[in-house]
Every structure is written in structure tokens, then in C-alpha cells.
């Protein structure tokens, strides 16, 4: 089974919006998406699976017997979530380490649907965009002003997380650059030492050769 990685460079910011798309897969295909997420950030994944109907030349919504296996791995390649869901659902998880989170999806379709083409609608929401404020206002009985203040506070918190994540990325990049420069320096020194040793050995060898031939 071949992984098809679709890199989604979705850096969070205040203007960051949800990512909505759809893609086609067969029964044996596996699609993976990369989402860069700060730590302690909520991610919501909404999806819907449709089965291709050759009679109507279209896709049937909510086909029975079709589900999706969803697996989420964090930046340390640890499994955050792995389970089988129905043909339509909403998945939620919270990141505990900053960095790239890989979201992989593949069909768990039975032999009845073997070889069929599927269309998967996918919507990924990160941070404040993953919060249903209408539901929050209803549950906590917030006024419009209180809800707006809550949204602003969440935005400030998300901006802080994003800034911390950017600093983390800059520090990691700096360490990588310093490590690369150090390796290049040591490799250059090693090459220089090898060349000097080879030159010295060749000179000794030539001197011995000339002495043996009584040319010097």
C-alpha cells in the first residue's frame, strides 16, 4: 500500500481559515495530509465519504458499509489517534507536541465495494476555528458581548501559541544549520588532513624510489 503524501502548508495565524477539499481514492489507497500545529491546540477533522455509482455516473452520499480508518501521528511519529469511523463523521484531537502532524485516511470497505472509487470530502479546522462558538454561547449562556470577548481571548491565546511555535521552528532551524556547518567544517578539515598525509606519503615513496635507483 503506497502512501500518497499531500503536503498542506497551513500555518496558523489570525486570518487562517479552514481547509475544505475533496479527493478520490480507491479501496487500497491511503491519503495522508501534513498539518503544522502548535502544542496544546485543538484540531477538528470533518469528513464525508461517497461511493461512485456507475448507473448515475455520480457519487452516492453516506453509502452503507463504507467507513474510514483514520490515523494521526505527531511530530515524534507517535500515534495520537487510530480507529475506524463511519462514512461521515467529526474527529477531534489535541496536539501535545508542536510540529507536523500527519493525518492518514484509507477505506475499510468490504469485498462488496472492492475496487470502487470513493470521494472523500475533508475539512480541517485548527485552533480557534475548531471551536463552535454558537454551541459555546448556548451552553454557557453568554451574551453577544461576552461571546465576542471570549473569541478575542481565544484569538490572543492562539497568536501566542503560534508565536511560540515560530520561535521553536527558528531555534530548531538554527540548531540544524549550526550542526550542518560544524559537520562541513570537520569534513573539510578531515579532507585536508588526508590530502596532506597522502602528499607526505607520496614524497617519501618517491624519495625512496629515487634513492633505490641511485638518482639522488
Swiss-Prot record:
It comes from Drosophila yakuba (Fruit fly). It is a single-pass type I membrane protein. Residues 21-183 are lumenal. Residues 204-216 are cytoplasmic. Residues 1-20 form the signal peptide. The chain crosses the membrane at residues 184-203. This is Transmembrane emp24 domain-containing protein eca. Residues 30-126 form the GOLD domain. Belongs to the EMP24/GP25L family. InterPro entries: Emp24-like, GOLD_dom. GO terms for biological process: dorsal/ventral pattern formation. GO terms for cellular component: endoplasmic reticulum membrane. The keyword rRNA-binding does not apply.
